[in-house]
């Protein structure tokens, strides 16, 4: 391929200076280039969200969040040996506390002090939890970045199909012995080109090459030389790699961005449902603690009354032991409930991205979602039409079908058409400037064919993609079946929760009637009767509270599994037409009545 450059020493110096300036400009434009990439990434994300519809949102890339990196980093000497801190057992210390015998009263006082609420705790509502998670949750940020990476991969693939400019400047020094003295020369070569991939395979390119040589020894004659050349080339496949299969990487990258948009939107729905479940569980645990505290108080009252009966000789002494035992069991259960609640709060804070050492107070929230009318046939139809994961699973079958076509195309022979044209300056003129001589125009057209004598690897890939296609079809049908099971389970879950609520309401009423009957005739009831009645009332109240929580979650699960859940950009549930969404908040939701 012809090369050309600048002729005289001044031109060589100018070319060298131009190359240095170009390098500096390239380094200085890195930041602006990254800003352009961020803008284009956001544009792709916006278009994918708009294509998805349904009020979908998209994250916006923020370059300030990421490590900028260094062009020439200086690493520490031990960079290949990261330090590990793992001291032997002899360097560690274990300090045991002395065993102290405590009675029930001292245990109660110490436990109440340990579980006392922090007055400086930050109140956390469900809405504020959602808002905090959207900004700080590692899980949510990872989902956003997964979406961003799909857009970046599309940009990278689209860039491969855009005109790609290149410019290479090289400066060389050459010395050659002439018998009595050395001849020294300085040469500068600049190659400016652009290439473009063709939509149906192959590529075209154009390059402008200049070459200049400056003789540094002018003791006899100056042998300075300069030439230019313009080269146009096209390489077009006619069999393997020809046609629409050439665009498969670009097609797949664009489809992958659509899949990423669906996955992110489905993640937002799942995230809302799971956070709602976590929060309602915390509220349920708070109510369970209130129920446990009430049982401890009632058990202590039964214990005091039984002691009085024993002291008056109206009952056997072992009845007092039974009452004491029940109080201790109630205290132990309350201790376990409080510890389980603290553990749940720490896990909830961790999921929100909040430091676990921060003190928070959960503000009780109760959803007031209307019970939907469930028609199983219609629900399944909605799920098959609207569920984003099913749509992606269906479209993956098309992806694997195209991969089979690409693999089949790769089994063909290579038949390529090469066209090249080289226009250069007059080689008989030492310094030709930027002028071309049509008399020195070279044109080449060549057709080459490579027979497919060895296509074993390609045949294996074809069979592999055919198997993967069948697996994707089965995967789609399995996903449909799994979705149908989930929809049916969600519909039955609503009915199950309604039934459980009705049963537990009657159970609570029966337990309270039992307790009232014992209170009306205390002398006829033993300590066992009283403690059994308290346990039954606590279990009934806990079961009723759990049924209420399960009903609200069952409604949310039904909306999500049928593809009808919609979430605002702020992370809140969007009511469907005909659906009224209400929330009750505040400490008054926790029943602390004696």
Q: What is each of the regions a protein language model found here?
A:
Residues 26-29:
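C-terminal motif of bacterial Sec signal peptides marking the signal peptidase cleavage site
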Residues 31-82, 346, 355-377, 423-429, ...:
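Acidic, low-complexity, intrinsically disordered peripheral segments
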Residues 35, 132-142, 148-163, 191-221, ...:
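A glycine-/polar-enriched beta->alpha junction
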Residues 71, 82-132, 136:
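Regulatory alphaC helix of protein kinase catalytic domains
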Residues 112-122, 169-233, 363-376, 404-405, ...:
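Small/polar, glycine/serine/threonine/aspartate-rich low-complexity segments that form flexible
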Residues 133, 195, 315, 319-324, ...:
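Amphipathic alpha-helical coiled-coil scaffold segments and their short linker/junction regions
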Residues 143, 147-157, 267-294, 301-303, ...:
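Amphipathic alpha-helical coiled-coil segments
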Residues 172, 186, 226, 230-239, ...:
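Hydrophobic, small-residue-rich alpha-helical packing segments that form membrane-like cores
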């Amino acid at each position: 391929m012809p090369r050309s450059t600048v002729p005289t020493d001044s031109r060589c110096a100018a070319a060298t200076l131009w190359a240095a300036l170009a390098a500096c400009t390239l380094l200085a434009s890195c930041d602006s280039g990254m800003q352009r990439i961020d803008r284009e990434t956001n544009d792709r994300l916006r278009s994918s969200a708009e294509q998805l519809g349904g009020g979908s949102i998209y994250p916006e890339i923020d370059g300030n969040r990421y490590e900028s990196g260094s062009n020439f980093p200086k690493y520490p000497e031990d960079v290949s040996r990261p330090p590990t801190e793992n001291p032997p057992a002899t360097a560690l210390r274990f300090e045991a506390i002395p065993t102290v015998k405590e009675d029930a009263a001292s245990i109660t006082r110490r436990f109440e002090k340990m579980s006392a609420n922090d007055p400086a705790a930050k109140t956390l509502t469900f809405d504020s939890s959602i808002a905090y998670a959207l900004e700080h949750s590692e899980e949510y940020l990872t989902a956003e970045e997964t979406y961003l990476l799909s857009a970046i991969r599309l940009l990278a693939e689209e860039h491969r199909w855009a005109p790609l400019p290149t410019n290479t400047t090289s400066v060389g020094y050459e010395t050659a012995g002439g018998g009595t003295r050395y001849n020294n020369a300085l040469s500068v070569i600049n190659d400016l080109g652009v290439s473009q991939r063709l939509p149906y395979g192959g590529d075209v390119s154009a390059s402008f090459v200049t070459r200049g040589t400056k003789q540094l020894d002018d003791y006899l004659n100056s042998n300075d030389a300069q030439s230019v050349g313009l080269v146009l080339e096209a390489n077009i496949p006619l069999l393997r790699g020809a046609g629409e299969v050439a665009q498969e990487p670009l097609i797949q990258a664009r489809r992958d961005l659509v899949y990423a948009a669906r996955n992110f939107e489905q993640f937002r729905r799942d995230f809302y449902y799971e956070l709602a479940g976590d929060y309602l569980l915390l509220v349920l645990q708070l109510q369970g603690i209130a129920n446990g505290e009430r049982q401890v108080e009632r058990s202590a009252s039964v214990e005091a009354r039984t002691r009085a009966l024993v002291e008056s000789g109206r009952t056997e002494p072992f009845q007092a032991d039974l009452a004491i035992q029940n109080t201790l069991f109630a205290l132990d259960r309350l201790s376990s409930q409080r510890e389980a609640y603290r553990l749940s709060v720490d896990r909830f804070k961790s999921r929100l991205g909040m430091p676990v050492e921060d003190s928070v107070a959960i503000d009780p929230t109760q959803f007031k979602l209307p019970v939907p009318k469930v028609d199983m046939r219609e629900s399944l139809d909605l799920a098959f039409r609207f569920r984003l994961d099913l749509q992606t699973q269906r479209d993956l079958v098309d992806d694997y079908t195209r991969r089979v076509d690409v693999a089949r195309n790769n089994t063909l022979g290579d038949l390529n058409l090469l066209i090249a044209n080289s226009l250069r300056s007059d080689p008989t003129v030492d310094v030709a400037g930027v002028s071309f001589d049509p008399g020195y125009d070279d044109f080449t057209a060549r057709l080459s064919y490579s027979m497919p004598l060895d296509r074993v690897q390609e045949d294996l890939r074809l069979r592999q993609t055919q198997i993967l296609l069948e697996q994707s079809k089965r995967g789609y049908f399995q996903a449909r079946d799994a979705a149908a099971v989930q929809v049916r389970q969600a519909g039955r879950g609503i009915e199950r929760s309604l039934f459980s609520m009705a049963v537990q309401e009657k159970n609570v009423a029966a337990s309270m009637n039992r307790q009232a009957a014992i209170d009306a005739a205390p002398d006829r009831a033993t300590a066992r009767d009283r403690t059994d009645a308290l346990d039954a009332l606590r279990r009934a109240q806990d079961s009723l509270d759990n049924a209420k929580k399960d009903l609200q979650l069952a409604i949310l699960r039904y909306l999500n599994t049928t593809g009808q859940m919609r979430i605002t950009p702020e992370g809140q549930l969007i009511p469907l037409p005909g659906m009224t969404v209400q929330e009750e908040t505040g400490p008054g939701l926790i029943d602390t009545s004696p």
